[in-house]
Amino acid sequence: METIFDYNQIKQIIPHRQPFLLIDRVVEYEEGKRCVGLKQVSGNEPFFQGHFPDYAVMPGVLITEALAQTGAVAMLNSEENKGKIALFAGIDKCRFKKQVTPGDTLMLEVEITKIKGPIGKGTAKATVDGQLACSCELTFAIQNA
């Protein structure tokens, strides 16, 4: 897959930094409409130290955060939103279907379905090897940083 935005370019779009930046690269992008990101899940992730030491599973809340960050890339890379921040304002219909473990490549897909003023909504799914790991509906609030 071709890289549209690499790790350093993502850091120019969203304000997240290590250890909380959860997208490694963007492979598909339509400004304000859609974004597909990838996260290589490593056994060295700090959250695996406690979740769980003998049975490493990526916390579901971090999968949803990775999806929210992917949606933020779709919304914040426009000229009108440059320098702004996307806050996670809500999550609905969230379901976890597959565990995400070290060695997995997490594909993060977000489609923005509605933007009204500073509020955006989107549908999101995370997959591993084509299998659904998580799906949800996200709500974002855009504001000045």
Swiss-Prot record:
Keywords: Cytoplasm, Lipid A biosynthesis, Lipid biosynthesis, Lipid metabolism, Lyase. GO terms for biological process: fatty acid biosynthetic process; lipid A biosynthetic process. It is found in: Cytoplasm. One of its GO terms (molecular function) is (3R)-hydroxyacyl-[acyl-carrier-protein] dehydratase activity. Its EC number is 4.2.1.59. InterPro entries: FabA_FabZ, FabZ, HotDog_dom_sf. One of its GO terms (cellular component) is membrane. It is an enzyme of class 4 (lyase). The active site is at H51. It comes from the Bacteria. It catalyses: a (3R)-hydroxyacyl-[ACP] = a (2E)-enoyl-[ACP] + H2O. Involved in unsaturated fatty acids biosynthesis. Catalyzes the dehydration of short chain beta-hydroxyacyl-ACPs and long chain saturated and unsaturated beta-hydroxyacyl-ACPs. Belongs to the thioester dehydratase family. FabZ subfamily. HAMAP family: FabZ. NCBIfam families: fabZ, PRK00006.1. This is 3-hydroxyacyl-[acyl-carrier-protein] dehydratase FabZ. The gene is fabZ.
